[in-house]
């Protein structure tokens, strides 16, 4: 969902999620948008750069990566549950599991880099 607003005389677009509005960390919506769009890491990072026009610090970026991993696991588990009820999602389930697995590794690498820089 997109909201068109004016800020300081300029037209801006905001990404919103009416289903979960006000009930969670807004960074979950960024992560879910990436998952639903089947973005790769380069596309995820480009979206984060576009969304955070003032810049995004590493802590928030890693948090979004964590949400991508957690939400990928959530949706892959949901697909498995539905499969047991006779509903097949094909490749979608595997893609969601890959988000969980791949972003877990990305998070581990990012945290390792922070530790090496003394930024724990």
For each feature predicted by the language model, list its residue ranges:
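Short amphipathic alpha-helical segments and their helix-coil junctions
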Residues: 44-63, 100-109
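Active-site acidic catalytic loop and adjacent metal/ATP-binding pocket
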Residues: 1-30
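Active-site activation/catalytic loop segments of kinase-like enzymes and analogous catalytic loops
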Residues: 26-56, 69-87
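ATP/Mg2+ or Mg2+-diphosphate-binding catalytic cores
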Residues: 77-120
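An alpha-helical support segment within catalytic cores of ATP-dependent transferases
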Residues: 5-10, 49, 56, 102-103, ...
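Conserved short-loop catalytic and cofactor-binding motifs
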Residues: 18, 35, 64
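Start-of-helix signal in alpha-solenoid helical-repeat scaffolds, especially tetratricopeptide repeats
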Residues: 62, 66-70
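Secondary-structure boundary motif
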Residues: 7-8, 53, 85, 109
């Amino acid at each position: 969902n997109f909201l068109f607003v004016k800020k300081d005389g300029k037209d801006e677009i905001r990404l919103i999620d009416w289903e979960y509005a006000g009930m969670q960390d807004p960074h979950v919506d960024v992560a879910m948008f990436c998952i639903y769009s089947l973005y790769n890491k380069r596309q995820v990072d480009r979206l984060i750069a576009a969304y955070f026009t003032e810049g995004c610090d590493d802590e928030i970026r890693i948090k979004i990566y964590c949400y991508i991993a957690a939400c990928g696991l959530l949706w892959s588990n949901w697909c498995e549950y539905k499969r047991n009820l006779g509903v097949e999602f094909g490749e979608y389930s595997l893609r969601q599991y890959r988000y969980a697995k791949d972003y877990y590794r990305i998070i581990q690498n990012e945290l390792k880099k922070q530790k090496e820089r003394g930024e724990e």
